[in-house]
């Protein structure tokens, strides 16, 4: 199939710039005939006792670092305990061996790669990289979230290749806000546990602790796996022949307990509902002859129409970009024609798209 087969017109005003007033107050589109548009807090009405929801419990880290002088880096993947790959903007302003000081901590540019990618090393005093990011980093909101407020950045003093950043913050000029205290809460699922993602597994953002409690009370099961979402999730497909596209790799983990719960539910004929494309990709990557295997691994699975699914019966997901690998995935899962029609309906109904947008519950075709 061609990349253009997965295109559709999306009005820019439907790209959600902020989360809904409450997590569960977003809209939910149920993919039945006819389509049902409801509120997410009603999701329990479309599930039944014995269903198994599988969640991604990865926690978003504050992966965005302002280096001063209008330079930012967004961490991508952990390479070792003290080294990460990252994307820099603008990368042309950075050089190998540049050093950036945050109080008594240091970030060093160790390598420059193609397409704005770099490698960095953290030299920290008595704290972990995650602790450092919690203090100095920002929530890495997607680039399509553009806001009119001013964003602050640290005052920077440069001597040679060394830049010192202090806690006196001044506003960027002509830059949109990418982080607020509200984002620190709302761009994180309520059940997140394991730090490592640089983008949210967004289907889970709609769940509240109250909804999770109600699902449990109704006999609807829940279990958790981990996929650390990388920045590559936002990379566009640039080849017209979609099968020439190279997927990014991401770290996944499924515990023996989770694998046992999923396999038991499958054997008993219970419905498996994947909460998000990250969960579905992890399940399919781990499955062999219909059996989900426990373990830690990296996946670059690219799911397109014609893929033979072995795990989930239903998929809860947000609305995705035209021509994206995730739109291709849902076309594979729930039908090419059906998803184009569903998206036309969602656009007509002014439903909100992407990370802070609305959700849809799909059945496997």
Curated annotation (Swiss-Prot):
**Which InterPro entries does the annotation name?**
QueA, QueA_dom1, QueA_dom2, QueA_sf
Pathway listed = tRNA modification; tRNA-queuosine biosynthesis
Q: Name one Pfam family in it.
A: Queuosine_synth
What are the subcellular locations of this protein? Cytoplasm
Gene Ontology terms: cellular component: cytoplasm
Cite the SUPFAM superfamilies for this sequence: QueA-like
Main location per UniProt?
cytoplasm
Task: Tell me which EC number(s) this protein carries.
Answer: 2.4.99.17
Q: Which PANTHER family match?
A: S-ADENOSYLMETHIONINE:TRNA RIBOSYLTRANSFERASE-ISOMERASE
Q: What does this protein do?
A: Transfers and isomerizes the ribose moiety from AdoMet to the 7-aminomethyl group of 7-deazaguanine (preQ1-tRNA) to give epoxyqueuosine (oQ-tRNA).
Q: Which family does it belong to?
A: Belongs to the QueA family.
Give the protein name, as stated in the record.
S-adenosylmethionine:tRNA ribosyltransferase-isomerase
Provide the gene name from the record: queA
């Amino acid at each position: 199939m061609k990349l253009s087969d997965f295109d559709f017109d999306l009005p820019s005003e439907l790209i959600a710039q902020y989360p809904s007033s409450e997590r569960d107050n977003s809209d939910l589109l149920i993919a039945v005939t006819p389509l049902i548009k409801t509120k997410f807090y009603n999701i329990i009405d479309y599930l039944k006792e014995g269903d198994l929801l599988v969640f991604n419990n990865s926690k978003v880290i504050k992966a965005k670092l302002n280096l001063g002088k209008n330079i930012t880096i967004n961490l991508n993947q952990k390479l070792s305990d003290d080294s990460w790959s990252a994307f820099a903007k603008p990368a042309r302003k950075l050089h190998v061996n540049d050093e950036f000081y945050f109080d008594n901590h240091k970030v060093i540019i160790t390598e420059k790669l193609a397409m704005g990618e770099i490698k960095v090393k953290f030299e920290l005093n008595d704290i972990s990289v995650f602790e450092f990011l919690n203090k100095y980093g920002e929530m890495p909101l997607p680039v399509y979230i553009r806001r009119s407020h001013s964003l602050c950045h640290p005052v920077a003093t440069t001597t040679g290749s060394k830049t010192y950043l202090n806690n006196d913050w001044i506003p960027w000029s002509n830059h949109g806000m990418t982080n607020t205290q509200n984002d620190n809460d709302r761009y994180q699922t309520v059940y997140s546990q394991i730090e490592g993602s640089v983008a949210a597994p967004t289907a889970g953002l709609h769940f509240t602790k109250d909804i999770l409690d109600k699902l449990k009370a109704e006999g609807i099961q829940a279990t958790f796996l981990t996929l650390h979402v990388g920045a590559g999730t936002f990379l566009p497909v640039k080849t017209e022949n979609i099968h020439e596209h190279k997927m990014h790799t991401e770290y996944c983990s499924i515990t023996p307990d989770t694998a046992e719960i999923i396999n038991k539910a499958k054997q008993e004929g219970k419905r498996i509902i994947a909460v998000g494309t990250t969960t579905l990709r992890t399940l399919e990557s781990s499955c062999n002859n219909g059996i989900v295997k426990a373990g830690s691994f990296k996946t670059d699975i690219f799911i397109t129409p014609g893929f033979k699914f072995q795990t989930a019966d239903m998929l809860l997901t947000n609305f995705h970009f035209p021509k994206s690998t995730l739109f291709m995935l849902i076309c594979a899962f729930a039908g090419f024609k059906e998803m184009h029609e569903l998206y036309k309906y969602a656009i007509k109904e002014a439903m909100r798209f992407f990370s802070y947008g609305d959700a849809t519950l799909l059945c496997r075709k």
